[in-house]
């Protein structure tokens, strides 16, 4: 009886432990990294359009999207540049990684407080392109 009770408790504990472990989300089947190194509205519009097109084209399989902003392109992420703020914020909310190059930030004396809070910083824009 004691052995049976211990076996039942062990099975119950294993079931609870298993139930609390959520399965990991399946990785996206597709991945794309865009680079943005120019400071003009037409290029930013085209980039945001391409992001939307990619998301729609691969929504069934899943797609991981990252944009690396460096050089003059980093101005898209400055809080003072509000023209594309809402669209960039929505992209970030949808899972798009918006990476700001720290090398460019240092060179242009841009601080973390100067860029949108929904962006992330990467050590080097070019290195990030190579890594991903």
Predicted features by range, described:
Residues 7-15:
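Bacterial N-terminal signal peptides
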Residues 1-4:
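Positively charged n-region of N-terminal signal peptides that target proteins for export
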Residues 20-132:
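Secreted/extracellular ectodomain signature
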């Amino acid at each position: 009886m004691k052995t049976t009770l211990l076996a039942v408790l062990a099975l119950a504990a294993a079931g609870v432990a298993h139930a609390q472990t959520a399965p990991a989300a399946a990785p996206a089947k597709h991945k794309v990294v865009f680079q943005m190194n120019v400071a003009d509205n037409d290029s930013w519009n085209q980039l945001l359009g391409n992001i939307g097109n990619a998301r729609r084209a691969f929504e069934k399989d899943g797609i991981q999207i990252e944009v690396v902003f460096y050089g003059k392109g980093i101005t898209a992420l400055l809080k003072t540049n509000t023209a594309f703020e809402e669209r960039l914020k929505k992209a970030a909310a949808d899972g798009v990684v918006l990476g700001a190059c720290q090398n460019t930030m240092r060179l242009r004396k841009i601080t973390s407080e100067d860029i949108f809070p929904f962006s992330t910083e990467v050590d080097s824009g070019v290195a990030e392109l190579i890594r991903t």
